[in-house]
Amino acid sequence: MQKLFREIGFACLLLVLALLLVFSLFWALSIGTVKLPVREIYETVLAQFTSGEPITAPGQGPVHDIVWLLRLPRVILASLVGCGLAVCGVIMQAIVKNPLADPYILGISSGASLGATSAILLGICVSLGPNFVGIAAFIGAFAISLAVLFISNLGGRSNSMKLLLAGMALSAVCGAFSSFIVYFANNKEGMQTIAYWMMGSLAGAKWGELAIIAPIIMASVIFFWTQSRVLNLMLLGDESAITMGTDLHAYRQWYLLISSLIVGFAVYAAGMIGFVGLIIPHVIRMFTGPDHKRLIPVSSLTGAIFLVICDGLCRIIIPHTELPIGILISMIGAPSFIYLMIKKTYGFGGND
């Protein structure tokens, strides 16, 4: 009976979060330089779905263009990136058994940024097609992921401190190379894009990007949710997992590959947005516990809500000016990271 009540409570929590996500989406659609009533937004979206017109077709009125071509792709991208980064944080923390792990802190986001910077300013990977920037960002993210694991295992078994130090060092290296490329690149338009993009922004969201990013992130989140048992075993350690008949080495490589894919395309679409993968999983773990069957769906919804709200705030904090979302997230995330670093019980179960 107690288990039944827990399952009902968990289902209610997911329902509440889903409703909060819908509410935050409509709120974000209504604010900005031009404020729109929620009813008008609802009617515009409903009319577009029932009209049969292509989703990118302009010229159906100013409200339609604002809602459908500018704001809706943006808020959907915010929810997808928030969802993906939060789940990546959960996975990274399970892989390295460190609740302070996060794609940004471990340097993976910086690797993706270096890959994307190289693609935009130097034309690297341009032969791979129209989505070459996303592919280059993924390659950079995955390469840094492997490098962090390799360096942290040098001179003995990896531990939390070695992982954090390796990630921070490689993040600095990637930042230095990115700055070097920007400094010497003879591409003014590309340099302006990179400068704004490194601060994080969802302003350039387009339906074409969503058609690529949405399936990748949603499929990855669902995949990780189906892997909850293996992720729970990772928290117990390799020896315990082997006694239960599971070798975690191959799983870590696959999870790292898929996480890098999410981070790469998130950085490609939204720029450098840090700390989402650190803050959200840690807060949610305090309510759901370390069980990934609960942690992953709750973190994904909360991450989506968090980034949608932050993006909305970036548009209204300073009148007539949009604050890059990476700045706001860092102002929230950096103090949170310091707090977790000095807190004595920041482990998966509160005792690590």
Briefly describe each language-model feature range.
Residues M1-D352:
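Alpha-helical transmembrane segments in inner-membrane proteins
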